[in-house]
């Protein structure tokens, strides 16, 4: 919650070119660090850092459906978190999760092939390896954002600490 409050407004302003309509930052009244289970409803939220440091997934136990949010996207995910090794681990966790159906916020029903392609893309970005343009299939803007943002988030905390209130 404190991270959301601290960085939320800054991120909204920084990413305005990607907004569709107006956005208001509303902080949650319940947070969790590992899992949040609603046993009566057969619903479980699981901390799954990757797309952001505070990403989570939601498992509907009754229907065996895993909602992965923005963690998996076709053809490539937005990389807005500096720990890409953790992101890859989260995607491996999702790939091996025993759900009958996995649903992405932007890509609908997904399969392990897409998850593997997302992992491979993240690994290439992490290691600075060349990426064939066919991998991001017409999503050059997302790819360029990922490469540029990778540098930004790598040094964000250091710059924020040095500049304090002048950072924004």
Give the positions of each predicted feature.
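Accessory terminal helices/loops
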Residues: 3-16, 95-101, 109-168
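Metallo-beta-lactamase
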Residues: 1-49, 53-118
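Phenylalanine-focused residue identity feature
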Residues: 10, 32, 38, 45, ...
């Amino acid at each position: 919650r404190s991270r959301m409050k601290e960085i939320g407004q800054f991120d909204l302003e920084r990413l305005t070119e990607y907004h569709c309509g107006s956005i208001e930052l509303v902080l949650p009244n319940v947070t969790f660090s590992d899992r949040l289970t609603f046993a009566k409803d057969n619903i479980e939220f699981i901390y799954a850092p990757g797309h952001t440091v505070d990403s989570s997934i939601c498992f509907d136990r009754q229907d065996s459906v895993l909602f992965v949010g923005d963690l998996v996207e076709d053809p490539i995910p937005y990389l807005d978190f500096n720990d890409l090794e953790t992101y890859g681990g989260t995607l491996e966790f999702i790939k091996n999760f025993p759900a009958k159906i996995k649903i992405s916020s932007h890509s609908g029903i997904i399969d392990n092939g897409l998850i593997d392609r997302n992992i491979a893309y993240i690994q290439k970005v992490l290691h600075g390896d060349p990426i064939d343009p066919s991998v991001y299939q017409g999503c050059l803007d997302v790819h360029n954002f990922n490469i540029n943002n990778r540098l930004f988030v790598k040094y964000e905390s250091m710059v924020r600490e040095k500049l304090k209130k002048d950072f924004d």
